[in-house]
Amino acid sequence: MHVPHTVTDYRDVQPMVESTTDMVAAALQRSPVWERMRTASLPLHARAAYLEQHWEGLKVLNDALETAGCDTQLACALRDYADALGTALDRAHATAKWREHHVTMPSMLEFRRRVAQLVEARNAVGIAAHAVVRLAAAGACPMHGHPHISPCPAVTVVATEEDEEAFAEELSAATLMVLAHGSDVCRSYPVDHDRDASCALTAAKIRNALR
């Protein structure tokens, strides 16, 4: 589905965006990974790895929007959240070098593949849906000293009833991918886990494997 970067007479999907934002926040707060963060049973490096998934997701989607020539307001929101999350992770790691060796979970690889498909198809509706969910997840993430960032901007690429149905379907798919990050972290960092045996991959390892 090829969709222009914006349309003049777009459909109002703001109620859908707001309900999705609330649902994502509630689902994350009930998730096992958040429970382990609350009970301090998740190691600090595992907590950082979890936040890194959302940071990477924000960056991937910003690049996707720019490549597809899509909604610039969504891209700005993604960059703002990525900067805020990156700064929080800089403090957590006490260095910015983690950006070259950050942890990439299996669910992030799946997410990257899906976004690449949407970019190739120039599917602005699908990319916007993933941006909405990722912004909701980033906004809900526990970050010390989290600055106030404006809510998700209006989505202006949904032009038809078919677009609206596709948007709703992609919101659901994006939500499942976001929740999968927490499941990956819990599996990769069980209580008393062996860090060397973790299934987590670093960006450097992935690059080496692709050479």
Predicted regions and their residues:
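Metal- and O2-centered redox machinery and metal/ROS homeostasis
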Residues: 1-211
